[in-house]
Amino acid sequence: MTDWRDVVLASHNQHKLEELRSLLADLPWRLHGAGELAIPEPDEPACTFVENALIKARHAARLSGRWALADDSGIVVDALAGAPGVHSARFAGPKADAKANIDKLLKATETLEGAARSCRFVCVIVLMRSADDPSPIIAEGVWTGRLSRIPRGKGGFGYDPVFLDASSGLSAAELSPEQKHTLSHRGKALAQLRARLAG
């Protein structure tokens, strides 16, 4: 029988795995990345973060036989009709890296001024206790800010260097890990998840 503490993260993103391991370090879980278990990535055909997270969690739970935690997240720019949104990881193409995605986003927003540069990070986390879990836990966090015109900072990953936190004015890549955990969309979603697990 599979130990419930062995939880698979339905992601091949090593940065995301490291961040979630840090954020969940006090839980009795052993978090394993999908890549470590040779679980292939599923198609993510949906148009919402919630649907994509459910697809990923169910896929990982089915193939691993373990509890599965999925995170679908991205940056949303209202002036771009919500783009990059659910396509954040592949905004500049299926094989794009963070730099290419950032470059495309900055190019698409170069004429935007003031409030039009507002944006938000969105994170939806789903926990499924089996592939047939009839009531998965769904948690969502939002982090509001605005787009920088140039990348700033060396920390974080993804779009962090161009996301300016609304309260501090620092980019997500300029924040310490502790500051980021407190403010971030992922930190907020995980706080909701913890509350649901405790309740």
Give residue ranges: language-model regions.
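Anionic-ligand binding patches
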Residues: 2-8, 14-32, 36-199
